Amino acid sequence: DDLVAPPYDVIDPEDLDRLLPRSPWTAVRLDGPDDTEKAARLLGEWQDEGVLVRDERPAVWLLEEDFTGPDGVPRRRRGIVARVRLDPYGSGAVLPHERTFSGPKEARLRLLRATRTKPSPIFMLHHGTAPSPTGEPALQAELDGVVSRLWRIGDPAEAERALAGAEGPLLIADGHH
């Protein structure tokens, strides 16, 4: 619970005051700072100290989130956390968000260049169905009333089955600007 953070673009100064003391390893320390060189140094320290490690084997992660919508109705969304191939812009594989702003895009590009990574995922939508997870989640966290659970799928055949439900192009929904 102490490591997760909301998307960087909704974090205000009060959120920072609440999130930063929770852990020296909270995600907001990498994804939120205006000082991209500091974020790059911190990322390097976390990697050197073994706080953040690369998974040795490829995996797909199933994500399930329980939350209450703005209408007061409890909801559950399921998704897949995976990398996607970069295709040429305009190929139709990934559909752009309807509107972005140059300031946030430039800030994200500075962070990407400084850290050589994208600290938070890009949220995309697709037609199809995410598989229902089974067993106990590998990770579970709660932040601001949203309970998030992750299941790791390391078996290549299982990962292929999990990805088979994603049909057609991906639509960028958030995390891109």
Question: What role is predicted for each listed range?
Answer:
Residues 1-177:
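A cross-family signal for N-terminal binding/gating loops and helix N-caps
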